[in-house]
Amino acid sequence: MLFSSYTFLFQFLPATVLAFLAARRHSPRAGILVLAGASLFFYGAWQPIYLLLLIASVAMNFSLGLGMEDPLRRPAIGAFGVALNLAVLCYFKYTGFILDTVSMVSGIPLIFSDIVLPLGISFFTFQQIAYLVDIMRGAKVERDIVSYTLFVCFFPHLIAGPLVHHAEMIPQFKRSRTGRSAVLAARGLAIFAAGLFKKVVLADNLAQFASPVFAHLDAGGGVPTSWAWLATLAYTLQIYFDFSGYSDMAIGLALLFGIRLPVNFRSPYQAVSIIEFWRRWHVTLSRFLRDYLYIPLGGNRLGKQRRYANLMLTMLLGGLWHGAGWNFLIWGGLHGLYLSINHLWHDWRSSQKRLSAPGLTEKGLSWAITLFAVVIAWVFFRAKTMAGAGKMLGSLFGFDGVGVAYEPTGVLWMMDLPILVGPERLLLIGGGMVALAFAIALFLPNVSQIFGYHEYRRAPEQYAFVRWHPNAAWALFTALALSSSLFGMWQRLEFLYFQF
């Protein structure tokens, strides 16, 4: 069930909100039970058989947590639980990749049936691994099965995050004031509308200039440099508006029930370094990789060479977390390399005592280099095949696709738009859309800043002119965002991070 579907918007969500409000009148506990039940139904609506997997995962990890109350047994049970979670994740997500790799190296064809990847398995598995690791570190064991179930399964974040921490979620479920603020609900609805607009109006339309081109290259075709750059930049913006739009929608939905989720995006394309980019992009994943992988590996405490090795290993595994394939490994490896170079640069500046703030020219150059590096890495993230990624890179830099004619395909073609305006004019239309989307990403405040959410409750003065207030004007803007999104929902494109 997609957030951007009529079934969700006009059936599931109203029914859940009304049932929650009615249950809350009885007791806070009843409201939490309703949310837990609704969340399980939400997941089961996709494929009921995998609801059993989710329930089994929750029951297993909750029971392991209870068993870890005994300090003597805690390390062994915790290690077993982490290994078991990883084994389940590896079976569903990496079996095909492992067997394909073995077959390629050995030359022996291995026949196996495709395994359907359960939605959100990377997210709910990592959250529960973090829970077990925290108990091993001395955190309190959760004894309430309903609160634990909702921590894992709360439908706004269940499928594609944000990755949440038990310590920031479970206490909220137990507070009696949860869900009682009308202003909080109004802010949540407006944030949801903004996220839906980013997904349906921006991301899905940008996809029409990216997906057909990448598919064409994956199939062995070629494209001229102009179309290669248009598709790559369109995807760069598509994945940002798609995933940040989902995160905004999740935050907004949670606020309808008085629950606060963590911020997941902080205008990442405004970053002037790769280090800063990862403090702004998929913030909750960066937090997980730092706290449960990079720091346990030694972080930067064991010398510079070990720090760079830890960075590379962390980002390689971060790439594999996104998907089972060499393209994701290369994407993660590139970002590990970028981060290492960035830290080397900082170390060199420090050794030269160049500690003054960079000037405008240096910041502009740093921003351009950072964005260029991120864009190139996205090629591997998006391409379905290594050959397709290679052809895209060749086309971007003029080594491939010279003299190649490309006829646009996809939804735009089915709408006869290329026939009406011609391929060259269509290229200009796509360029205009990309330019507009970049302007939004680079020069406007992000949704959390506009709505004063979380750490942006005291937004800088320069954003005061667009700051959200519970008034008629913002009610109108919310209605316009919702209505324009509803008209665009006929495409029914899934969120990109559903595949992870």
Segments (PLM) and residue ranges:
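Membrane-embedded transmembrane alpha-helical bundles that form the catalytic cores
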Residues: 1-499
